[in-house]
From Swiss-Prot:
Organism of provenance: Human parainfluenza 1 virus (strain C35)
Highest rank taxon of the organism: Viruses
Record flagged with keyword Ribonucleoprotein: no
InterPro entries the UniProt entry points to: Paramyxo_C
Start-end of Low complexity biased regions: 25-34
Protein name per UniProt: Protein C
Length: 204
């Protein structure tokens, strides 16, 4: 029994024997806790304990939320940028930009795109199974081809961007996304094929 309830629930005999002392205890308790009917004291005490428990729980939960927020803030921004290509900025060099857009158009419409999706499909089929590779292999063929083309375009725009992309720029960008690629083998395969297609743009 909580110590603050012992003075309230004392036997009547002890109450009569120590009337003065009991009266002082009662006054002290009355000033500390709200007066309530005897039958409701246990219920109110229970809810008080429950409220305290909830406060403790919420008090301990706050650092966890803060920690997750801090971790998300420390997470390398390049990972989110790879997933949202538009946040990377466009290719500024008019020549490279024209070559890039022409290449992307061929990926979607020409025989180059057909060869690309076949190569990607075979490489993904031959790799060690992952949730992503399983999802791709189970797709309907036309949906899968479009999905692979879109992912290739994303990597092309990720690799070829800025004022003028050179080989050292690609090396730097590859190092940025390397930890991400180590966790996403399918993305690594698509990035490699995208780089093969775009290498001539950088070498111009």
């Amino acid at each position: 029994m909580p110590s603050f309830l012992r003075g309230i629930l004392k036997p009547k005999e002890r109450h009569h024997e120590n009337k003065n002392h009991s009266q002082m205890s009662s006054d002290s308790l009355t000033s500390s806790y709200p007066t309530s009917p005897p039958k409701l004291e246990k219920t109110e005490a229970g809810s008080m304990v429950s409220s305290t428990t909830q406060k403790k729980t919420s008090h301990h939960a706050k650092p966890t939320i803060t920690t997750k927020t801090e971790q998300s803030q420390r997470r390398p921004k390049i990972i989110d940028q790879v997933r949202r290509v538009e946040s990377l900025g466009e290719q500024v060099s008019q020549k490279q930009r024209h070559m890039l857009e022409s290449l992307i158009n061929k990926v979607y419409t020409g025989p180059l795109g057909e060869e690309l999706v076949q190569t990607l499909y075979l490489r993904i089929w031959a790799m060690k199974e992952t949730p992503e590779s399983t999802k791709i292999l189970q797709m309907r063929e036309d949906i899968r081809d479009q999905y692979l083309r879109m992912k290739t375009e994303r990597w092309l725009r990720t690799l070829i961007r800025g004022k003028k992309t050179k080989l050292r720029d690609f090396q730097k960008r590859y190092e940025e996304v390397h930890p991400y690629l180590m966790m996403e083998r399918v993305e690594q395969i698509i990035m490699e094929e995208a780089w093969k297609l775009a290498a001539h743009i950088v070498q111009e």
